[in-house]
UniProtKB/Swiss-Prot annotation:
Keywords: Chaperone, Cytoplasm, Nickel insertion. This is Urease accessory protein UreD. It holds the Pfam family UreD. InterPro entries: UreD. It is found in: Cytoplasm. Coiled coil: none annotated.
């Protein structure tokens, strides 16, 4: 770790994980795995016929407090593919005045396939968090990614919100910016920005088309008792947004959408990660 990083995070813990994947002998393999602090690869499974690895990322402390930072840097070399997930939710606890930070960057060379499908992120009352996620997607590459954001603790009542959450998402395509967006939530605007709901979920997929958009919209409208959700197509980026108060229900919705679109985006039948079944 550099002196600059050490100085920047002297008030908290740094967890850093850098992964490279490459195609070797017909199998996508982890060719580089470098970690700093309590953040590492828990397990690599080869459950699929084409030898796509399912990789579980583990942060043993189970949560972040003010001053902590997690950095995930993933590179896929040409023609490789991987599914990345986590065994548990990312938890952001009450702040000591400092921000908890997560930084994700995914670099996809040509003709790769990435699925970044972690468990939810939970922002507890009085937490302060910054999350920055960037996808750099070269020509011919495919991505499905989702995340579910839970603001506050439903069991503690309606007034328990995070102090501040600042989330950046950047999707950079080979020939265009793709998508850039920012969500800022705090104690004062949480109810207004989320329409009274406590959970916001986002899924995006590249490349997509009108046929896939139609399937997702049909799926959303066919679900009984579903509260708020929608899907749109921004050039070749499918964007799905869901709101609700039941985290298990929304998680099932995300998994159902992923299961439906995977054959069209990734090009093969969906196979659930084992950890989703526990």
């Amino acid at each position: 770790m550099s002196d600059e990083l050490s100085q920047n995070f002297i008030d908290g813990w740094l967890g850093e994980l850098r992964l490279n994947f490459a195609l070797r002998g017909g199998r996508s393999v982890l060719t580089r795995c470098k970690h700093v602090g309590p953040f590492y690869v828990k397990k690599v499974f080869y459950s699929e016929n084409d030898n796509t690895p399912h990789v579980y990322l583990l942060h043993p402390p189970g949560g972040l407090v003010g001053g902590d930072k997690l950095v995930l840097d993933v590179k896929l070399e040409s023609d490789s593919r991987v599914l990345l997930t986590t065994p548990g939710a990312a938890k952001f606890y009450r702040s000591n005045g400092l921000y908890s930070e997560q930084k994700h960057i995914f670099r996809l060379e040509r003709n790769t396939a990435l699925e970044w499908v972690p468990q939810s992120s939970i922002f507890f009352p009085k937490s302060k968090a910054k999350i920055d996620t960037t996808f750099i997607i070269e020509q011919g590459s495919r991505v499905i990614s989702f995340d579910m954001l839970c603001f506050g603790n439903l069991s503690l009542g309606s007034s328990t919100y995070p102090e501040e959450v600042d989330i950046h998402l950047n999707i950079c395509l080979s020939d265009s910016i793709g998508l850039q967006e920012r969500l800022r939530i705090n104690e004062l605007n949480c109810v207004m920005k989320l329409g009274g709901f406590r959970i916001s979920a986002l899924l995006f997929a590249v490349p997509s088309d009108e046929k896939t958009l139609y399937k997702v919209r049909k799926l959303i409208t066919s679900v009984k008792h579903f509260q708020v959700g929608g899907a749109t197509l921004l050039d070749e980026i499918l964007v799905v947004r869901l709101l609700g108060n039941d985290n298990q229900y929304l998680k099932k919705m995300l998994h159902h959408i992923w299961y439906t679109i995977r054959p069209f985006i990734i090009g093969k039948k969906a196979m659930l990660p084992r950890i989703w079944l526990t």
